[in-house]
Amino acid sequence: MSAWASQEAAKEEEAVGDFARMLERRDAGLLARVLSRAQTGPEAYVRGLWRAEVGLERWRLTRVLGCGSVACVFELGDGALALKVPTSRRKAPVLLHEVLIYSHLAQQAGGRLAERHVVPFHGVAAVTRREYRRLRGGEVVPALVLERMDTTLEAVHRRAAVSKGQWWRYARDLVAALQFLRESCVVHGDIKTANVLVRGQDAFLADFTSAAVCDAAPEPLTTTLEYCAPGLIGGGQPTHSTDVYAAGLCLLALITRFEPFRELSMMKSHSSAPTHSLHETQWLMNAISKGDPIKYNVLSQDLYDRWAEELHFLRRFFVPAAQDALSRWLAESNARVAEHAF
């Protein structure tokens, strides 16, 4: 082995150990659950996820696909994969928490996440300042290797109105994803149109940084305000029911072509953009607490008339539902997709 190859191998081993220690400090309970199913130890688990071909100078970032407070997502190489990189070393444990959630979900799905309408996860790579200039010299952070999608549901509704057939496809996909999360005992905690990715005509849930396994200690509340269920406004924790509520708001945005409560807020403030003032936030919290998002978002009779069946279907997302509700909704949305295929 050449001196350069030996040096790279040593760096890789050091990064594997570093990431394993981060996982043990941040998520010991969830890590133990994942390791029990994988029948391995922390370092062997990280090594099993390692994507050497996209780590430590073996890959290049081509363009930014999206950026948030925790991470930026870059297109990789030929565009088949995307890399989610923490914005700083301090944010790295948050992404490793997401790695564990993805691992848990992949175990539940037998590795076939796409079939359950969750963005496929392909492992972990190491990123240094040489690849990502926002990092400090000598820092190495974990990055998630994900399947690259075409766009977000937010971009879809901003670009053009969707057909009824396509709306029912998105509804079916989101209900299928919600059902899978419930079966896997995972609460997403931050479902919104920006976190629903689209490839072709299909939708997939992404961004599990706020997610939690049901019987684990609750994560800090980071749900986007516009997508909060009324119970979260009063200090409650995210649940499967609040995930369903947020998914309903995503589907409502496809009908109105506005993010939740945005159109009414613009009319109220005579502004074309949200003000983010304290007064605006208080107004938004009051509107959410009413528990009637259809009333506060569908502001024209024409929309009510054109989307009557879909709005009737959506009302169920905003009230307490029976345990078997998702199965029934999935069957109904599948039937509607079939109807619109002809």
From Swiss-Prot:
Pfam families: Pkinase. It is an enzyme of class 2 (transferase). Keywords: ATP-binding, Kinase, Nucleotide-binding, Serine/threonine-protein kinase, Transferase. Residues 59-342 form the Protein kinase domain. The active site is at residue 190. SUPFAM superfamilies: Protein kinase-like (PK-like). It catalyses: L-seryl-[protein] + ATP = O-phospho-L-seryl-[protein] + ADP + H(+); L-threonyl-[protein] + ATP = O-phospho-L-threonyl-[protein] + ADP + H(+). ATP binds at residues 65-73, 84. GO terms for molecular function: ATP binding; protein serine kinase activity; protein serine/threonine kinase activity. Its EC number is 2.7.11.1. Probable serine/threonine protein kinase which may function redundantly with MPK1-independent branch of the PCK1 pathway. Belongs to the protein kinase superfamily. Ser/Thr protein kinase family. This is Serine/threonine-protein kinase ISR1. It comes from Eremothecium gossypii (strain ATCC 10895 / CBS 109.51 / FGSC 9923 / NRRL Y-1056). The gene is ISR1.
